[in-house]
C-alpha cells in the first residue's frame, strides 16, 4: 500500500467519513502524482498558498511542509472541522461563491487543488476574470477538460475555454493521473495543469469573455455572423469586421476556431469595449 493510501485510511478513520459523490470527491492516493504537483507548486516560488478541497490531506500535508501561510477552502463540514482541529484556517464555503480578493494581499499566491470536476471549468474562468489575483495555479482536471483548456487552433477541442484561459495564462501539462490514482476511482482519466499569469492587453476581462462566448456561440457559423449582435451594439459594420479579419490574414469566411488567442485579443480591441 502506498504512503498516500495509508494516510487516506488513517485520515478517514479519524474523520469518520467516506468520499461524497454529491461533492465530487475522489481522493488522490498516488505518491507519484502528489509529488509532481508539489514540485510544480515549489517551482512557482509561492509566498502564500490557497487549496480548494483539501479532503483528508493528500496535498495539504505536503503543502504544510513548505512552511508558508496556507488557506483552505472546504465545503464538507466534517472535513473542515478536522482541519480546524489541527489549527488551520478553513473557509467553509463554495469556492465559486467566495470573495477571493481576501487572499490577495500583494504576496505571490499560488492556488492548488485536486478540483471537484463539476467546478473545474468555472474555477478557471473565475480566476481568469481577475485583473489581479493568484500568480499561478496547479490544478487537477478531467483529462478532456484539460485538453480543451490547452486546445489548439482548428482542433475539435478548441473553443471558449481554450481562448479565454490561454489569453491570460501560460499553461503546461504537469502529469496525467489514471482512475487507480484516486479513491474511489473515477470513471475518467485526469490531468494536472499548471497556470502562470501572463501580461495581457485586455483590461475589461468580462467584456472579453462575452466577446469570445459570442464568437463560439454556433461553431458552424461564420465569425462575422456570430459577432453580428455585438457589431450592431457597438454601431459597427460587417464591412469593418471583414477589414479587421483581413488585417489578421483571414478571409471573411473565417470561423472562430481559426483564430488564436492573440488574434482574438487583436480583433476584440477593435470593438471598443476597453
Curated annotation (Swiss-Prot):
Primary gene name: rsmA
Enzyme class, spelled out: transferase
Catalytic activity entry: adenosine(1518)/adenosine(1519) in 16S rRNA + 4 S-adenosyl-L-methionine = N(6)-dimethyladenosine(1518)/N(6)-dimethyladenosine(1519) in 16S rRNA + 4 S-adenosyl-L-homocysteine + 4 H(+)
Family from the record: Belongs to the class I-like SAM-binding methyltransferase superfamily. rRNA adenine N(6)-methyltransferase family. RsmA subfamily.
The enzyme's E.C. designation: 2.1.1.182
Its biological purpose: Specifically dimethylates two adjacent adenosines (A1518 and A1519) in the loop of a conserved hairpin near the 3'-end of 16S rRNA in the 30S particle. May play a critical role in biogenesis of 30S subunits.
The protein, known as: Ribosomal RNA small subunit methyltransferase A
Source organism: Bdellovibrio bacteriovorus (strain ATCC 15356 / DSM 50701 / NCIMB 9529 / HD100)
Database matches in SMART domains: rADc (SM00650)
Principal localisation: cytoplasm
Binding site residues for S-adenosyl-L-methionine: 26, 28, 53, 74, 94, 114
Record's keyword terms, sorted: Cytoplasm, Methyltransferase, RNA-binding, rRNA processing, S-adenosyl-L-methionine, Transferase
Domain of life per record: Bacteria
Localization in the cell: Cytoplasm
